[in-house]
A protein has these predicted regions:
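Pyridoxal 5′-phosphate
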Residues: 5-431
């Protein structure tokens, strides 16, 4: 199909004499990111504060800010022309950047606005039938819980939630995997978990669970296969793994947390042989999807990216700056990011373990923890502890769960000195 004829059919063809705005932005990567101080210098974070809650909502590094500014300027100058000139190429570019980061095929990556959107689309679009069983846990976020409830109600399926550990700091991988897999029933069709629990900091052994499910599936027909879905947001941007390493079927994450990407962006990844299990909820605006509807592209099977990236117009200045966020991580190196985040987190946990009035909930082992560190201060609620820390200019967060712990989450924008200051502030928090 000719682009011009597609645009005429959508009523958007430009006048003959129109001058198209300059092509899409390419960020200069002339800044060296080989020291953590240089990495930090890329952010406009207030240097008078210690920022320990980037996992909640991130600040953007310079290349992301520059890309957003550029796209916003171009949209403000001539929105329709800028969109027309770039829409067909920009979204596939973003999928490609995400796919490169997770070592997957770009056709497997749908663009979303958040983890919540990805999970909502995944679970409510999941093909279940009456009597099918969904197995989940008691440690998941509101976004998973509610999406599963809507899915169960829609399909007359059941949900069972198992508790994998009573106390995260004492849990073992074997115990958790054993508890989860033992709860799988013949009618279980969907297992839904969270990679890193934002309520406790626990990191689940996703690959071991995937292998256990694969082994159960080897004795089932394709029709009875269990699908394994993961809310991956708090491992994404921390751990040095690929989708193949994780071994799940679907993976949802936003990119406005540990990836430091534009606010209102995220991905939903689907393994090719699982695509058929999900039906779309929001029509995609991809070139192939819309073109087929217009009758200008022969009807055919759409890939996951083209079918499951929800359409409607978006805050494109943000969405189209996602590539720069992935590039930023790749320029530093995924392993370096993982090692640094674990190093600072371990330092914090070791320090907190020695404070009498602190109860650390997150496992110390990096096998079972990622970048989130959860704790309680004796005699204080999590909100009170976080408020008290903020008077010392330390920005943490209280986990938004019915039972809430305080969280400090050092990342690659922090340093050892800041971690020491957090430990010192917590030593004196009751004074
Ligand atoms: C485990 C988990 N899943 C999902 C979400 C929702 O994230 P989003 O803002 O990307 O929808 C959060 C929020 O922090 C979370 O902690």
């Amino acid at each position: 199909m000719q682009r011009r004829s597609f645009l005429r059919r959508t009523g958007l063809a430009l006048g003959a004499g129109a001058v198209l705005p300059s092509l899409s932005f390419t960020s200069p990567s002339n800044v060296s990111l080989d020291s953590w101080a240089n990495v930090r210098s890329q952010f406009l974070l207030d240097p008078k504060r210690i920022h320990m809650a980037q996992m909640f909502l991130a600040s953007h590094p310079k290349p992301v800010r520059d890309a957003i500014d550029h796209h916003r300027k171009m949209f403000d100058e001539s929105p329709v022309e800028y969109w027309e000139h770039n829409w067909k190429t920009m979204e596939p570019e973003m999928c490609k950047a995400a796919a490169n980061y997770i070592q997957a095929d770009p056709t497997e990556v749908a663009l979303t606005d958040s983890t919540t959107m990805g999970l909502g689309l995944l679970y409510t679009g999941f093909q279940l039938k009456e009597g099918d069983d969904i197995l989940s846990t008691t440690h998941d976020h509101y976004a998973t819980d509610k999406s599963l409830e809507y899915a169960a109600a829609k399909n007359k399926a059941t949900i069972r939630r198992v508790t994998l550990y009573k106390e995260a700091s004492n849990a073992t991988a074997d115990e958790m995997v054993g508890t989860l897999t033992k709860a799988i029933q013949p009618n279980t069709k969907l297992v839904a978990v969270t990679w890193v629990h934002s309520v406790s900091g626990m990191k689940l052994p996703i690959r071991t669970i995937a292998d256990a499910i694969k082994s159960i599936n080897s004795n089932r027909s394709d029709q009875d296969r269990i699908y394994f879905c993961v809310d991956g947001v708090h491992g994404f941007g921390v751990e040095d793994v690929t989708m193949a390493d994780l071994g799940c079927d679907f993976f949802a994450a936003s990119t406005h947390k540990w990836i430091f990407g534009p606010r209102g962006t995220g991905i939903l990844w689907g393994r090719k042989d699982a695509w058929n299990k999900v039906v779309p909820t929001i029509p995609a605006f991809s070139y192939p999807a819309y073109g087929m509807w217009l009758g200008m592209i022969p009807q055919g099977k759409l890939n996951f990216c083209d079918l499951h990236s929800p359409g409607g117009f978006h805050s494109f200045e943000n969405r189209w700056a996602l590539k720069e966020a992935f590039d930023f991580h790749m320029q530093i190196g995924k392993k370096k990011v993982a090692d640094r985040t674990h190093q600072l987190g371990s330092m914090l946990k070791e320090g907190l373990r020695g404070v009498n009035h602190i109860k650390l909930h997150t496992p110390v082992s990096t096998e079972l923890s990622s970048g989130i560190n959860c704790f309680e201060v004796e005699g204080m609620t999590s909100e009170e502890a976080i408020k008290k820390l903020s008077t010392k200019k330390i920005i943490g967060s209280a986990a938004p769960y019915p039972i809430s712990y305080a969280r400090l989450t050092p990342s690659i924008i922090n340093n050892e000195e800041e971690v020491k200051m957090c430990i010192a502030a917590l030593e004196k928090i009751k004074e």
